[in-house]
Amino acid sequence: MLRLIALLVCVVYVYGDDVPYSSNQGKCGGHDYEKDGLCCASCHPGFYASRLCGPGSNTVCSPCEDGTFTASTNHAPACVSCRGPCTGHLSESQPCDRTHDRVCNCSTGNYCLLKGQNGCRICAPQTKCPAGYGVSGHTRAGDTLCEKCPPHTYSDSLSPTERCGTSFNYISVGFNLYPVNETSCTTTAGHNEVIKTKEFTVTLNYTDCDPVFHTEYYATSGKEGAGGFFTGTDIYQNTTKVCTLNVEIQCSEGDDIHTLQKTNGGSTMPHSETITVVGSCLSDVNVDIMYSDTNHPGEVDDFVEYHWGTRLRFFPLPKRCTPVS
């Protein structure tokens, strides 16, 4: 208790060590204020003048109570009440304390309809661009501007933030397998989407994919096999659909089912994949899938990778194989 009293005494007199002095033609130095021809000490931010100065006594300053503040040097008779809590579409960006008013701004997904002296007073939800349209910018107030997605781009969701994404006209599905025993090096042209050996069958099924698969490829080197399925480049993916690939590797022996997990890659284009291995002929499988816009090489690619097993060193596809019609 004595410690608290000592602190309050210090607060009261820290601004009042010197008695007031006479003003110079109504002017005072620093932050001092003039009263009845005397220059008196002002209170620091976070305090108010609980008693103004007089002959022989300087200003008495007291701290602001909770919910009130003073932001600058002053000799005000009371602290200012803080703004009320931020509600609705408003979120607090500056809490109320002894030296600051509460500041409210729009929460994510909203924009300011009415600005106040300190923050925003009224917020409203931003416009959401429908599927087939993307965000092109914002109004001066911060509302969303939408534009129809140009050719070879897409937006498939109702969103106040999503811009039109790029599409693709080429898909390559490459895989590496271990161990394999049968020696092979073949290229197959035609709408087959199946690679078959004595040990396993690799089948590619797909739905809602516009680029057309027309080439299959498989080769071996030692105990490792590599192959793939490839499309042409003359058709772009319809951006209102999601290209879905299902790659199944069916061993000639066993019936265990393993679903490969994605280990690398993101998605900025409309596609999804499922990769499964059925049977017990393989210990390691790696599947790489690339979606590309060949008219913008290196700029517009989605690359995803799926892996199962522990062996990570795989050999690349041979540059040449004997075509098989």
Curated annotation (Swiss-Prot):
Top-rank lineage group of the source organism: Viruses
Keyword Membrane applies: no
Lineage of producing organism: Viruses, Varidnaviria, Bamfordvirae, Nucleocytoviricota, Pokkesviricetes
Stored SUPFAM superfamilies: TNF receptor-like
Cited PANTHER family: TUMOR NECROSIS FACTOR RECEPTOR SUPERFAMILY MEMBER 1B
Segment forming the signal sequence: 1-16
GO molecular function per UniProt: tumor necrosis factor binding; tumor necrosis factor receptor activity
UniProt cross-references to SMART domains, sorted A to Z: TNFR
Official protein name in the record: Tumor necrosis factor soluble receptor
Glycan-carrying positions: 105, 181, 205, 238
Function: Binds to TNF-alpha and beta. Probably prevents TNF to reach cellular target and thereby deampening the potential antiviral effects of the cytokine.
UniProt cross-references to Gene3D superfamilies, sorted A to Z: 2.60.240.20, Tumor Necrosis Factor Receptor, subunit A, domain 2
Any one biological process term the GO annotation gives: regulation of T cell proliferation
InterPro entries on file: Poxvirus_TNF-rcpt-II_C (IPR010806), Poxvirus_TNF_rcpt-II (IPR011172), TNF_chemokine_rcpt-like (IPR051670), TNFR/NGFR_Cys_rich_reg (IPR001368), TNFRSF_N_viral (IPR034059)
Cystine residue pairs: 28-39, 40-53, 43-61, 64-79, 82-96, 86-104, 106-120, 123-146, 129-149, 164-185
Keyword terms, alphabetized: Disulfide bond, Glycoprotein, Receptor, Repeat, Signal
TNFR-Cys repeat start-end pairs: 27-62, 63-104, 105-147, 148-186
